Amino acid sequence: MTATADLWPLFPDHIKQLQTRAERLFKRENLDLVAIHSGQQKRWFLDDMNYPFRANPHFKAWCPETQLANAWVILKPNTRPTLVLLSSPDFWHTTASLEGAPWLEEFHVEHISSPEAIEKLLPYDKKSAAYLGEHIEVAKALGFENINPDPVLHFFHYHRLFKTDYEIACLTQANHIAAEGHVAAADAFFNGASEFDCLLKYMAATRQGQNEVPYNHIIGQNENASVLHHWMPDKKASGSLKSMLVDAGAEVCGYAADISRTWSKQHNEYEELIAALDQITLALIDKMKPGVEFPALHQLAHEQIANVLFAFGFVSCSPEQMIEDGITTVFLPHGLGHPLGLQVHDVGAAQADERGTPIAPPSGHLTLKTTRTVEPRQVYTIEPGIYFIEPLLQKLANSRNKHLINWRRVDEFKPFGGVRIEDNIVVYRERNDNLTRQTALDAYVKKVTRLA
């Protein structure tokens, strides 16, 4: 758990708001108890080693310490939430220390000596109780019948998008930490470092290891910048460094930052393309307001990308035809963005209401997973990109639209891989708060980039 002391004055109201939501759920679903299981360690196959522990995100919403296996949050109507902690002696492993943690004051705390001992804190009759967690076998052994019921999950997932002040503060701190990593990785790149060495610089600057961050670091140089999730960093430095795309974050009390930046080794046309994407990012953020449907933003992104593809001479037809024929999806094959919070791709992104009514993506954009209408106090990423992805380009070269592409021009940019710019945005009623542009990263970009 990475946090500063100024978070904790915000925590009581956060718990109060979560409890208020839960009270509505208890009445609606006729529940007397919801037991949220943090999870438990999992062994490697045929081994005595464990995978890194990842807590149930529903547990993380209540508990800021994310490294608590076999812990529980028990919710009851009109009752202070109970935090159950496993307190058995363990000389094999280091366990998280909660001594003196100020946020514990918001809970009634119980200690159990073994994972099985949770049974004594649960009612015998569980017909009006629900289990939320990954371990179905644990729930069944404890006698739960309502295991991850859809009405409960849909309710919590829908409301997860509306952030409390505490949650926004966590996301803000995570952005500042991640920004330090991005600056360190960029410095290493400009000094000729490999992808792997840039990764090491990133981790050193953020003080967060690979098992602490919300998702695997993506650091791709040259052609590797065209791989959307390049998770195998090259340990050998390239003899001809051209570009680097970094998509990496940080975590504070379970809340994620998710930032992408792209760098050019030289001041050239590729850097101009980066600058064009940066302007598109800011323009789209300016259009993201309460009442706007996210698919409309996604469509606008493709219109802007089409303009850039035409302006840079990659495609010769009109922007309208590019979109109609699906050419822009070759260069931008992913969604414009997603909700951000306890999960990098946070849940509830395609729900119309708390009952879970789905909102389908628009025709031709099936990869768009965020289809909700934007509302105040929601947090989204905005991450347009232009990529030169060999399999997609090959498919385009074999299509009826191949004559519309300036293949010589495309070949000039393929060695750079691609470009992605990604910011984290809090939406308010009258304004947007760009958490990423308030960090040290913004000043660094302006210092090292000619076109910033």
Curated annotation (Swiss-Prot):
Molecular-function annotations in GO: aminopeptidase activity; metal ion binding; metalloexopeptidase activity; phosphoric triester hydrolase activity; proline dipeptidase activity
Gene Ontology biological-process annotations: proteolysis
Residues that hold Mn(2+) 2 according to the record: D247, D258, E422
EC code(s) of this entry: 3.4.13.9
Cofactor: binding comment: Binds 2 manganese ions per subunit.
Binding, Mn(2+) 1: D258, H338, E383, E422
Keyword field: Dipeptidase, Hydrolase, Manganese, Metal-binding, Metalloprotease, Protease
Annotated disulfide bonds: none
Catalytic activity: Xaa-L-Pro dipeptide + H2O = an L-alpha-amino acid + L-proline
Entry keyword Protease: yes
HAMAP family: X_Pro_dipeptid
PANTHER family per the UniProt record, alphabetical: XAA-PRO AMINOPEPTIDASE 3 (PTHR43226), XAA-PRO DIPEPTIDASE (PTHR43226:SF8)
Function summary: Splits dipeptides with a prolyl residue in the C-terminal position.
Protein name, UniProt field: Xaa-Pro dipeptidase 1
